[in-house]
Structures are given as C-alpha cells and as structure tokens.
Amino acid sequence: MALTKVRGTGAEGLTLASSAPTVTVTNSMTLTDGDIAFASGHGLNFGSTSDVSGMASELLDDYEEGTWTPEIIGDGGNSGQAYQLQQGSYTKTGRQISCMFFIRFQTEGSFSGSYLRLSGFPFTIKSQPQTVHLTALYFTSLGDNYISLGLQAYEGTTSAFIWGKKSATTSREYLGTSDLTNATDLSGSFIYNI
C-alpha cells in the first residue's frame, strides 16, 4: 500500500471533503496542541466494548465544568439572608452531575414554611427515580442538637430538602426554619443524574 503524505499550509490547515467523511487511524494519534471539537450530538463512542443487558448508550457526548450559587431557602419563602461565603462548583460528564458547595452565613435572615432546602443546583434532577438521597453534610453552629445531616431530593427539581438526626436511635427529621444561626456552616459534595 502506498504511503500518502498530506501537508496543510496557511491559516486553513487541512480540510477533508464531504466525499471522504471518515478517517481511520490504525495506531494511536497524538495532538501536540489544540483540542478535538465534536459537533452537537456526537462525542466519544465506546461501541466496541462489551455491554451489560441494560445498556442504553455508549456515547459520551458532553463534558463541562462550572460554578453554581448554593443558597438555603424555606419551602414557603425566605428573606434577609447574607452569606459570608457562598461557593459552588460542578462537573458534568454525560448525564452525571458532580457538585461541591460551601455556605457560611453572616446573617440568617428569616424563613417561612416548615422545611429548609439547599437550592440552586446547576441542572434539573432526572425524572426517575422519584426520591434521591444525595449525601451527608458537614455542618457547624446549628440552632438545634443534630448529630448528622443529609440531603434528599425529588425528581424534576433543582433543590434538596435538608434532613437530620438528633441521636442514633431517633428517626430522621427535616430541618425546620428555626434550625439555623448567624454562624451556620454547611458543606458537602453530591452526585445526581439528569
């Protein structure tokens, strides 16, 4: 088989015509600079790998990193909150979202309703399953004596209820609107699907 060497010059580089849409590389390929850009709806296809019976897709078609703004809200509203720190970051790999957050209150403000939620997720939670346990939380300076906190989210939302336990033998309960203070810290990391 003859070897053909193709060199592109100038600002345009190398362009393949639509009559030759496929390029096959028999060995590895190395980019010394630049990126590989995929058209929308395309990506890395892992179709040559073995699958389990429930496999629905082998195409990794999205990746991004960014920030989000976490906040605590009451299920009936809230006002007057001020945060000393309010940080959130996320990584989206396909349909999976990995989030981290840290909140430090400066002024608690007031909350109405019965329960508190962590709000502002960067993407809406997948419609199934209905209820998702997300993570345990780090916390300090609550207005009540909790020994653990966690997040419980529901389909089609961008927030999660905060729940806790006050002893190892008691049932969990959702944090109420009086359970925070001006010195409360909350932080954690969690994963969900969209």
Annotate each language-model stretch with its function:
Residues 13-16, 48-58, 67-93, 104-126, ...:
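Surface-exposed ligand/attachment interfaces on beta-rich extracellular proteins
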Residues 99-101, 119, 186-188:
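Hydrophobic residues positioned within well-ordered beta-strands of beta-sheet architectures
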Residues 159-174:
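Cysteine-clustered segments with highest specificity for TGF-beta superfamily mature ligands
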Residues 78, 103-158, 162-163:
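Terminal beta-strand-rich extracellular "head" domains
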Residues 31, 92, 153-155:
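Generic beta-strand structural signal
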